[in-house]
């Protein structure tokens, strides 16, 4: 088995905290300057079903949602699943092997390059209900100081090194990041669905026959259309130019785009494909994303100990029925948490104001300090429970309270169920140059990986 760590890039700074690393790679938050939001067409690379196989079997969820067991299942299926490109380490291979495979699949005809530059319309639906619809293109990379593409989470050097090594070896963007922006219009007038001109172009395009369509094992139907008309490209550019985009998902991949761009600029390279990165851009006025909560499981914290200590600073209400407890949590307007793991569930509300003030980092804004995840991290986990912040002590479960509670009961630990953050709070915090605490947001639906790739070779 090759030593896959040998080809990790060495030109990223080391020894920095996530805050320091993120500030350097995104760019320090300052008043808005520079060019506006750009999404440019590109010649997409797509699977050819007649050669590669059924599209449901060659695509996958985003790489960071794939654990080792899921990756092995995808690999066991053989064939051309994009996991062989996007997660080469799961197969014990180095990054260069993924790049070689990409070029081999292009030569064999399993992948094809579209003849003309295009923007792509992507849609995810369930049982005929559209959950997600937006534009896939090459988003212009901007320093955070430009106020155009806004991160809301810090990033870690390790995942950026991994993605940068892969992106360098493949010379390609293998999956899109997920961006949202407010296109304008409130959609409250009769016949007005909301959104800007770009959203209207998206809907008009989606009324036609899709380029590809399939139902995947996630229960969603995925569709893709292609826009090649330069006049429509120009309308999209004009509509989004003055907008801000929030990174809903893909902070480490966006940081990787920025690292690759910085590498080329440091080498004296002029403008090129490294000045943009593959992205799905969604008008949230027209198609609001689902913003789910990320629940915590603390395997080493007994439920009775957790509740006893929490009573010192929270009002605790006990429930026997899970559905009633989750519903009660959803109705609480302020910081609130639901603890599970034993036979009962325990709703924590009304945190002690003095304890809250003492536990909160003073350098953050009042809006940041009011986020449920900030209260959880600094008051409950850090101060009351004194649990270290690491992956062994704190596990996460996306969206599903029942799964988190069941996990806690299996481990003898404590589950902490949260309400989702409000999208407007996330955007406001990001707009001030702050980061929400780690594992605060779960935007969705996330775009399927493998629908369209962006190869950076000029000749492709």
Q: Locations of the language-model features?
A:
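Surface-exposed, charge/polar-rich loops and edge strands
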Residues: 2-460
């Amino acid at each position: 088995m090759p030593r896959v760590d040998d080809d990790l890039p060495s030109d990223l700074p080391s020894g920095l905290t996530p805050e320091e690393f993120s500030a350097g790679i995104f760019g320090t938050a300052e008043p808005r300057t520079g060019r506006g939001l750009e999404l440019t067409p590109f010649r997409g690379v797509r699977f050819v079903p007649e050669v590669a196989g059924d599209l449901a079997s060659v695509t996958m969820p985003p790489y960071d949602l794939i654990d080792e067991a899921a990756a092995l299942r995808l690999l066991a299926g053989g064939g051309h699943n994009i996991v062989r490109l996007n997660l080469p380490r799961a197969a014990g291979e180095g990054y260069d092997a993924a790049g070689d495979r990409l070029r081999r699949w292009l030569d064999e005809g399993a992948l094809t390059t579209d003849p003309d530059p295009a923007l792509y319309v992507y849609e995810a639906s369930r049982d005929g209900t559209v959950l997600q619809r937006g534009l896939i293109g090459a988003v212009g990379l901007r320093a955070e100081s430009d106020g155009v593409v806004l991160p809301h989470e810090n990033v870690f050097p390790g995942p950026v090194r991994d993605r940068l090594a892969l992106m360098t070896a493949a010379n390609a963007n293998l999956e899109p990041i997920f961006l949202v922006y407010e296109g304008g219009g409130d959609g409250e007038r009769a016949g007005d669905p909301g959104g800007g001109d770009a959203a209207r172009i998206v809907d008009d395009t989606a009324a036609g026959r899709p380029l590809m369509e399939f139902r995947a094992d996630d229960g969603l139907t995925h569709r893709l259309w292609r826009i090649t008309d330069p006049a429509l490209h120009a309308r999209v550019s004009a509509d989004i130019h003055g907008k801000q985009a929030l990174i809903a998902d893909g902070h480490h991949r966006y940081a990787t785009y920025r690292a690759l761009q910085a590498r080329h600029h440091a080498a004296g390279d002029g403008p090129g494909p490294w000045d943009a990165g593959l992205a799905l851009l969604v008008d949230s006025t027209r198609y609001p994303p689902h913003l789910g909560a990320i629940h915590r499981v603390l395997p080493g914290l007994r439920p009775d100990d957790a509740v006893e200590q929490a009573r010192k600073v929270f009002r605790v209400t006990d429930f026997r029925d899970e559905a009633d407890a989750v519903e009660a949590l959803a109705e609480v307007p302020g910081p609130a948490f639901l603890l599970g793991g034993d036979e009962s569930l325990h709703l924590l509300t009304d945190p002690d104001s003095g304890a809250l003030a003492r536990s909160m980092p003073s350098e953050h804004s009042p809006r940041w300090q009011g986020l449920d995840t900030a209260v959880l991290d600094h008051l409950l986990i850090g101060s009351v429970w004194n649990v270290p912040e690491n992956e062994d002590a704190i596990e996460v479960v996306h969206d599903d309270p029942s799964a988190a509670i069941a996990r806690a009961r299996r481990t003898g630990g404590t589950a902490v169920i949260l309400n989702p953050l409000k999208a407007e709070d996330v955007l406001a915090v990001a707009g001030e140059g702050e980061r929400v605490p780690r594992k605060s947001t779960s935007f969705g639906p996330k775009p399927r990986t493998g629908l369209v790739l962006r190869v950076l070779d000029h000749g492709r």
